[in-house]
Amino acid sequence: MQLYLRSILLVFICALAVSTARAASAVPFAQSVPATPGFCDAQSDPSWFKQHAKPRYARGFEVSYGHRTKKVVVRQPWKGAAQEFVYTLICPGVALEAVAGQRSVQIPTRRMAALSTTYMGQIALLRAEARLAGVKNPELVQTESVKERLADGRILGLGSGAAVDVERLVRLEPDLVMTFAMGDPTSDLHPAIERLRLPVVLNGEYLETTPLGRAEWIMFLAYFLDQEREAAEIFSTVEREYLRLSGLARAVRGPRPTVMGGSPYGDTWWVPGGDGYIGTLFRDAGGEYIFADKHETVSVALQFEAVLRRGAPAQVWIMDNADPQQLAQQEPRIRHFASVQTGEIYSARARADYCESGLANPQVLLADTIRVLHPQLLPTHELQFLRRSPITP
């Protein structure tokens, strides 16, 4: 059940779709920055890292710095986890005996295996594609610089679906395997990877409940790549633009446009929880989310009658990668929704790399949502991740 719930959540948050060329946008995507000395560099000032490399929005990890070591704590590796995962990162020259018995990782990472495509946008921003040796589910990758390396063999595919190609992973000889867990012993990969004596790290970014919190996991990745300065500068531009945009939406006077989210999956209608990522995005964009009172951080299952009763008056419907036209054929009653009758339906279907550069650039996701809910605020912004998808008669 946990696996199913997470897959439903990711369907909405990370609508994996076909990448298209980006249209001109009034809101910029984050850009890479020049390389700077890392913590392990002898010329670096350790005090900078202790002051500026700690998360401020992300709740799932923390870091502390020692003498040529970093201690990284993943506070919640999966929803409801009763344990933290602590990793000791060691710079060159530190004796392994000093960290015996600990989950230790030698840094900077040179050969990384990524078992989720959601890290690709941040890897590209850090210009770390050359350090990526393998990726699971390569057919889902949308980041162009990674796709090019997959195509010419510089990055290897590590299997598709829930399984990982263990033999290929071992042959890869990675110095870091980054993956996620759900607390399900039948599907979690990290125990088996640990038994192979490969350094494996759990990334809990998917549990963050705010767009800025999730984007700040670029810092987590940077700890292993020893690129905290670059990550901090990149995230600073993301944060500044996100806060500027949310301030614009917050300043709008009068009633907020009502918005509903989610779509049916089988016989059940799944809507984003009011306290989760999408609920926060709707709120920051100046919308009144009709299911804000569903105080969950993951998607919530509802009967269609409940959705029909509360969702029908909503002015805007922003869904995942579902096909609105197909939904109308399967469930004709949605044609009674106000959003359907006015054509104010937006989806992420066949639009862009929502799950990669979208999560790394929440300021653009926010701009898209503001453009939909308050078009007068961003008249020159062209939608990057959403598209208007009216249902025809």
Segment roles from a protein language model:
Residues 1-6:
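Positively charged n-region of N-terminal signal peptides that target proteins for export
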Residues 7-17:
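Bacterial N-terminal signal peptides
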Residues 10, 21-24:
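Cleavable N-terminal signal peptides
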Residues 23-393:
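N-terminal ligand-binding lobe of clamshell/alpha-beta domains
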